[in-house]
């Protein structure tokens, strides 16, 4: 073969272009050129400079990255990883990294996503999983500072830079000398920070490196922008779906908050991007009932010292609804959840309810402030990783519940966009409560209207003619208009016509209303107010007092037992306890005035049926009042009367005195609910025990009077003693009253059987009337004995009530024993007859040959 020279080679290549193309493609690839310049020992005879070769590399890499950008199916991290590999090669950097920027709880932060990328490293080795992220705020490190300033930072010597943090170096053992960091910015939002670390064969990155770095990161920016745009589209799409479906469901349900929340939350579950979420509903009670505060005021129960909502309510989750979306979908409802339930034990829902903050936590089990359960929370084996908790706030800015979301489906921690979506949902749910609140208010107004109409149709206040029948000013003063009379004249006329309290036995515990007419009882009631000296002291106009008393009488319906006679008897017993029983010494004249008036009103407008019947029949009263239904109605009726100036016997009191009267009305009338009796009797017993140990009467009076709570407890028990006082009357009175009570119960039982289609309890079953004595003995033993036994210990003057009770028990026990003996004889006779019939059947059956009871053998 001849000698090969340059001219021959050029001629051959020109004549064979295909060969030339394949040859140069093979020999002048980017990697080969790079290796030539990296290896200084390889001799290269060429006029092409390093910069020219770098431009060749850049052009080839740009083409490769363009293909990467348009590839489908890959993750953005994969595209960025390829770019960082090439960038590390071009810049001669030891390694490159990417930190993503995000916000949690309103605080921006950066999190490692790709770490230590080299030209030859694998994607799987560089990708940082959600559970291994290194997260730090923007005020730590040069990366955070680059995200904060949104500028490129070329740091020749990190030790001389005040923003440098050696946290990562300490974690990895790597030594950072110099670095180049650039943020990827979209508008005003920083998506990520790209960092090149430690220039190889040089002490720092040059200006030319910065230019290449900036130019090359345009491709990274495009990749991240595309991903960000897609992600934001997904966010807005999910948000719009949540709003649309929530609006659809909350307007389907207006009557119940729990059902309203459940419908909305269950419908939008697929758009929430989490494995599980729970809703904790808060008790909205702002003030305790007075009888629940008594143990606290007496020092028997420690005051509540736990967390409270911003509006002052105790943080009490009365129900938790747990939505499980991983594995098999399931919904768990936990009424009255215990404090150690896994959703509450961490303390996070309580913290959110107390402060109203949004709490977004990554790696929740490692948190030091909240104690999340580190292992599986239930039988499914599911564990908590990341948590996002938000308050549900209504239009009044009251926190009504707490929504907590667990474990984002892609394993990443919840970010600001998840906060945005869930906050949209919880805000909408909170605002939608306006619908249920409005519906509830309208419903209550409708019920109040129905009740008011019923009251007006059934009762009206006393007419002028009815007042004249008691206050006989026309007859005695020959005056046609009462306004023409002086108050002193009216007082004299009224007192003259009122019965004598001694002859009417108004001071006696044995008082019986049977000899008196209902009209006469009105006069007796007025007399009692004069006897406690409140008419003159509080300047009560006698016309108003007469009208009020007559109207109260008309307010009682003509039912079998809970009628005006019962109302008067309770008022008379209250008077007797105060005066004859000497309990008045614990109360002021104003308090005694209010107690006596409340006693007369305590059962006004009673319907002859109890609270349970109101609930069973879903009456307007039951829909209006949640507890102590009838008692609250009696209270509202009484307060309604006082709103009419012509009926307001307290019209001359000042504002503070009137508020005291209304409060005492509330305590006294609500206390007649026997369902509350067992709550208050132990507290009363302790007061009696304490007074028994005291040496003087003055000491006992001081012990009671200095504490308003003790006075209220005694007053509440006095109302119970008054309400049950018929059981202490002489036998000839008590036996008749008991039959009236029983008849009213039987009438309710008839209603339950016919109207409600339900079987009444034995006490209200007319078919079991013969068991009345036995029921009376049980009622005396279980309910009544304690009341009068304790009052007899408290004040010996009240012993006649206990004696009357014990005498009546003997009578009822005797009747009960007679009934039991009679029933025993009947049962024995029935057994004898049954035994005789069986023996006769055996005799007629021919020995052991038994006949079938269902078949006839022919």
UniProtKB/Swiss-Prot annotation:
Cofactor note: Binds 2 divalent metal cations per subunit. Site 1 may preferentially bind zinc ions, while site 2 has a preference for magnesium and/or manganese ions.
InterPro entries found in the cross-reference section: GAF, GAF-like_dom_sf, HD/PDEase_dom, PDEase, PDEase_catalytic_dom, PDEase_catalytic_dom_sf, PDEase_CS
The protein's enzyme class: hydrolase
Compartment(s) of residence: Cell membrane
Stored SUPFAM superfamilies: GAF domain-like (SSF55781), HD-domain/PDEase-like (SSF109604)
Domain of life according to the entry: Eukaryota
Binding site for a divalent metal cation 2: 603
Sequence positions that bind a divalent metal cation 1: 566, 602-603, 723
Active-site residue numbers: 562 (proton donor)
Example of a GO MF term: 3',5'-cyclic-AMP phosphodiesterase activity
Cellular component, GO annotation: plasma membrane
Pfam families with a match to the protein in the record: GAF, PDEase_I
Domain GAF: 75-224, 256-433
GO biological process: cAMP-mediated signaling; phototransduction, visible light; retinal cone cell development; visual perception
Associated disorder: Cone dystrophy 4: An early-onset cone dystrophy. Cone dystrophies are retinal dystrophies characterized by progressive degeneration of the cone photoreceptors with preservation of rod function, as indicated by electroretinogram. However, some rod involvement may be present in some cone dystrophies, particularly at late stage. Affected individuals suffer from photophobia, loss of visual acuity, color vision and central visual field. Another sign is the absence of macular lesions for many years. Achromatopsia 5: A form of achromatopsia, an ocular stationary disorder due to the absence of functioning cone photoreceptors in the retina. It is characterized by total colorblindness, low visual acuity, photophobia and nystagmus. ACHM5 inheritance is autosomal recessive.
Family: Belongs to the cyclic nucleotide phosphodiesterase family.
Full protein name: Cone cGMP-specific 3',5'-cyclic phosphodiesterase subunit alpha'
Lineage: Eukaryota, Metazoa, Chordata, Craniata, Vertebrata
